[in-house]
Design a protein with these regions (language model features):
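Fe(II)/2-oxoglutarate oxygenase catalytic core
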Residues: 1-155
Length: 155
């Protein structure tokens, strides 16, 4: 069975990635620390990450960046649909994107995002596709899908 997990390299240039990382680090007033503590086979794990909701306020400094990312994501979605043989019957006629978020995971810390479910009730049952854009190639950084035993290295 197709997992529908698809990797595209060089969606953003190195300069664009550096730009987003630098802007994230400077926009400390928009940083939110997310508590991701959870139980695992080893017991309770304290976990966090730092994120920015790029449309956190009407006067956000990220508005033009969001427009650029929305266009970039739209192009990726069209390629994704083609490469995964998605037919019109498998894709909604109308959909929208959630406000993009940037998440930072620091190496050698408790930063992580454990396996989870995004849909908890009727109100949140809108998400059907997730897109990750890795902005650096941190050694050891990856996304792991435990139920499929698939690991995607950041690059």
């Amino acid at each position: 069975m197709n997992s529908y997990i698809t990797v595209y390299d060089q969606v953003l240039s190195d300069d664009q990635c550096d730009y987003f990382i630098d802007k994230f680090e400077k926009d400390t007033s928009a940083h939110e620390v997310q508590n991701n503590s959870h139980f695992s086979e080893e017991g309770e794990r304290n976990a966090t990450l730092t994120q920015i909701n790029m449309l956190h306020s009407p006067n956000t400094i990220w508005r033009e960046d969001v427009n650029f990312l929305t266009q970039t994501i739209g192009k990726c979605v069209e390629v994704y649909k083609d490469q995964n043989y998605i037919t019109p019957y498998q894709w909604p006629d109308k959909y929208s994107l959630e406000p993009p978020k940037m998440k930072r995971y620091l190496a050698n810390t408790s930063d992580e995002f454990p396996p989870h479910v995004d849909v908890l009730d009727y109100e949140t049952a809108r998400r059907f596709l997730v897109i990750f854009m890795y902005l650096n190639d941190n050694i050891g950084g990856h996304t792991y899908f435990p139920s499929m035993d698939i690991e995607i290295e950041c690059k």
